[in-house]
Swiss-Prot record:
InterPro entries: Adeno_E3_CR1, Adeno_E3_CR2. It holds the Pfam family Adeno_E3_CR2. This is Early E3 20.6 kDa glycoprotein. It comes from the Viruses. The keyword Signal does not apply. Belongs to the adenoviridae E3_20 family. Keywords: Early protein, Glycoprotein. It comes from Human adenovirus B serotype 11 (strain Slobiski). The keyword Lyase does not apply.
Amino acid sequence: MVSTTTFLMLTSLATLTSARSHLTVTIGSNCTLKGPQGGHVFWWRIYDNGWFTKPCDQPGRFFCNGRDLTIINVTANDKGFYYGTDYKSSLDYNIIVLPSTTPAPRTTTFSSSSVANNTISNPTFAALLKRTVNNSTTSHTTISTSTISIIAAVTIGISILVFTITYYACCYRKDKHKGDPLLRFDI
């Protein structure tokens, strides 16, 4: 039973961490973590020992605007896991901090704009931006990864229970069939 519980916990943890976004930042830079598109986002920092804090309660180190979290002047102590939720959806981040002498990994930016930025007037650009933000909200029909991992863990646990009960029922017969074959007098 202990091995079943351990397997169940490891499976659910593997499912949870597979959906986590990994970000690599250098010391001294600023890092912005985007929150879910819903309402006001609450941010948590989770330490390796299980402790957690609210980074938005530390105004000198972090900046929160209601949705996004910005880590100001990243240090080696800022590495770890950050969790943002609006209690309808959530996002996980794993921050990996590199020394400032290590070059940051290359990032490629793609642009599909066919109009030069200086040809669009400010009101038109603001209207397009507002329409884009309104159209990019997440659907309420999507299922979060933590929900999927919980469902997977429960399904695995129930299947292990069914297997154990079936094994017990098939391998252990009633007492009248358990007799020693040398003491039977059936000829």
